[in-house]
Amino acid sequence: MRIVLQKVSHAGVTVTDEAIGELDTTFTEQTIAAGYVLLVGVSDADGTRQIDWLAHKISNLRVFEDEQGKMNLSIHDVGGSILSISQFTLFADTRKGNRPSFVRAGKPEHAERVWLEFNEALRAQGLQVKEGRFGAHMNVSLVNDGPVTILFDTEELGI
């Protein structure tokens, strides 16, 4: 799995109905105050081991400032929330040509299942998690706080 974590002061996501180019009224805008936006990419090799490791790491990561201005507090400590967005493009291969290849991204059925299980694993850690819609064209807005942006790649980490 590949995750781009962004610490935010607030964020939101809407879904666009591609057929008419307007907001999809069947999707309620999801918003959070302080917390994380997670852009989540899944490969076919990802499963329970990666889900559990990432959920534990992200829920305990200390990137919020304490009274002394030191990054010493977790998302639990500040009562933050998570906005989780599936994003297969994190597995783009740009080594050849000018059009990225996405062959390393997980097949949609597998990727959706892993993404949803990951979100549930975060909830099991006691976190409030809001979601975009898998496979949809989404408009994500956020205010990056810091900025703090951290990349997780379980393959690179050997997990």
Swiss-Prot record:
CDD domains: Dtyr_deacylase. One of its GO terms (cellular component) is cytoplasm. InterPro entries: Daa-tRNA_deacyls_DTD, DTD-like_sf. One of its GO terms (biological process) is D-amino acid catabolic process. The keyword Oxidoreductase does not apply. Its EC number is 3.1.1.96. It catalyses: glycyl-tRNA(Ala) + H2O = tRNA(Ala) + glycine + H(+); a D-aminoacyl-tRNA + H2O = a tRNA + a D-alpha-amino acid + H(+). A motif (Gly-cisPro motif, important for rejection of L-amino acids) lies at residues 146-147. Disulfide bonds: none annotated. One of its GO terms (molecular function) is Ser(Gly)-tRNA(Ala) hydrolase activity. Homodimer. An aminoacyl-tRNA editing enzyme that deacylates mischarged D-aminoacyl-tRNAs. Also deacylates mischarged glycyl-tRNA(Ala), protecting cells against glycine mischarging by AlaRS. Acts via tRNA-based rather than protein-based catalysis; rejects L-amino acids rather than detecting D-amino acids in the active site. By recycling D-aminoacyl-tRNA to D-amino acids and free tRNA molecules, this enzyme counteracts the toxicity associated with the formation of D-aminoacyl-tRNA entities in vivo and helps enforce protein L-homochirality. A Gly-cisPro motif from one monomer fits into the active site of the other monomer to allow specific chiral rejection of L-amino acids. Belongs to the DTD family. This is D-aminoacyl-tRNA deacylase. It comes from Bifidobacterium animalis subsp. lactis (strain AD011).
